[in-house]
């Protein structure tokens, strides 16, 4: 964490699950200031009171800025003096974005362009943009807008000598806001059947802590224009639902299949075939450098193409598949799950 000593970090969309995870990890370090930039004053007020209660000695390091990434001036107003940015602001609910695609464009695409424009103008040292596996071979509005967000980031990186811009791609972050596990827990507590979309559907799974780890890895190891992913495991939705049932006393026979929602895929991809051809293996991570060739293709016809890997696409069907016990152990290790289990024991 020495790179953050006395530095100012700005988190867009900072009142979400990712922002909370960053605060929990960073506040007790020697970071100078963390700026939470978001448009919901109620969530900011809740976060302010939460951290004043549980970390009163360091809560003053948090500064709150009301604004919207869609508004360039509000972004610029909050960015003066910022050293680093974690860009997490997004519309990420797949069905909602299917019904309101232009809202997804305004936040995920135009908002990202505003953040990166302001960052370059203000001389920010590094911006990490948070993307999603749905940006690879996208079929829904959310994934398409996040794919364009990545393209915007790469294009901006070509124009930036002083500001390093990288993207990270996530699978499903368990127990993050709007994710399915908290819904299932509520259904079990209320005596209702668990509802799932399609039992054989597979998804990458990772914890909020692993999500922060990926951003920090990109921050420390990424180069300008890079895309970085973690080699995450996956499981079927059926396995995930059964694991939650076993942990919280739900009845597996009560699991109800409701069908695939708008815009959903049977499996997700973290790296496409084309990206795998350029990917650099970094242990638990892959790094994909930007394609910084120019538009003058004549010289490439003469010189030939770069050397390419023989890797095939990295998706939730061909990664490590967790069985029921492995999935249950991974879910049980989450702090959110431990807190929910403790609440049940107290009743």
Where are these regions (language model features)?
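Hydrophobic/aromatic anchor residues within beta-strands of the central parallel beta-sheet
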Residues: 64, 104, 127, 165-168
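Conserved residues in the N-terminal Rossmann fold of short-chain dehydrogenase/reductase
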Residues: 38, 65-66, 106, 198, ...
């Amino acid at each position: 964490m020495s790179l953050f000593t006395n530095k100012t970090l700005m988190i867009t969309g900072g009142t979400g699950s990712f922002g909370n995870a960053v605060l929990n990890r960073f506040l007790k370090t020697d970071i100078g200031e963390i700026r939470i930039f978001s448009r919901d004053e109620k969530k900011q007020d809740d976060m302010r009171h939460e951290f004043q209660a549980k970390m009163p000695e360091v809560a003053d390091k948090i500064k709150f800025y009301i604004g919207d990434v869609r508004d360039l001036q509000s972004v610029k107003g909050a960015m003066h003096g910022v050293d680093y940015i974690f860009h997490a602001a997004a519309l990420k609910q797949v069905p909602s974005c299917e019904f309101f695609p232009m809202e997804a464009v305004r936040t995920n695409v135009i908002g990202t362009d505003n953040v990166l424009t302001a960052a370059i103008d203000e001389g920010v040292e590094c911006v990490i943009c948070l993307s999603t596996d749905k940006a690879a071979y996208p079929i829904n509005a959310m994934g398409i807008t996040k794919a364009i967000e990545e393209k915007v980031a790469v294009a901006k990186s070509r124009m930036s000598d002083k500001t390093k811009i990288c993207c990270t791609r996530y699978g499903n972050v368990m127990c993050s806001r709007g994710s399915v596990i908290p819904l299932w827990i509520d259904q079990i507590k209320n005596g209702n059947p668990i509802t799932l979309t399609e039992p054989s559907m597979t998804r990458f799974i990772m914890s909020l802590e692993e999500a922060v780890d990926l951003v920090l890895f990109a921050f420390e190891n990424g180069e300008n224009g890079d895309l970085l992913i973690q080699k995450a495991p996956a499981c079927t939705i059926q396995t995930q639902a059964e694991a939650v049932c076993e942990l919280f006393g739900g009845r597996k026979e009560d699991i109800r299949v409701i069908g695939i929602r708008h815009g959903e895929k049977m499996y997700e991809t973290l790296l496409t075939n084309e990206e795998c051809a350029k990917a650099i293996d970094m242990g638990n991570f892959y790094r994909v450098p930007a394609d910084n060739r120019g538009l003058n293709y004549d010289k490439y016809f003469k010189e030939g193409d770069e050397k390419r890997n023989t890797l095939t696409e990295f998706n939730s069907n061909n990664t490590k598949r967790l069985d029921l016990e492995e999935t249950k152990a991974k879910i049980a290790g989450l702090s959110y799950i431990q807190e929910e289990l403790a609440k049940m024991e107290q009743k």
